């Protein structure tokens, strides 16, 4: 028997998910559009030359996260959350490809090593990263940190989505007696505890309720993301790629103080699109 799982096990009316995807995409798309509109109001600036150097900058600062790593504690939890999110996003994409396009990727060793083991481990690491970030923000409280309600809501939402994922996975493993369940270590912990406390029918009910709650939470988060500082997840690599490669101070122009009526930038259109 080849290792895999039924994608929509215990879930009916899947069309509702696709219906909810429409307002989610509209809300998120409008948020991205607002950012693009502001950028387009800026002055033109050539920032796509020397592509090799720009790719190196992206690898150094966006992928390797050299700047963030200067603070060891912050660098660690930032890496756990960001790399974990990449893995979870890839895993979600694989599920969508299998469900909607019949690609049959979720099979065999790939299903066991990546879709089960790696996804579980990285999901847990995201939760650890969130707890570390919360400890820094609310216990250590460094002076340089800007404290906002939004930051706390983002951390809570990310932690909740990961927790929901483990509950949904664990109840599915337990209720179906999944022979491959041990490959999902944290979901399997939920499954083992649930078998002692819940009937199969109770697990099925809990599973479908948590599945829809997880979907609603995830869609709401995606719709909200472009309106929060989490937008930097998408813009940071682009921002780094489009950084000025000119020597420091090369962009400064000589100012005639007698003839110039205004100094600096006093309108949005005075900046370049990159600024």
Regions found by a protein language model. Give the residues of each.
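Membrane-embedded alpha-helical bundles of multi-pass integral membrane proteins
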Residues: 1-274
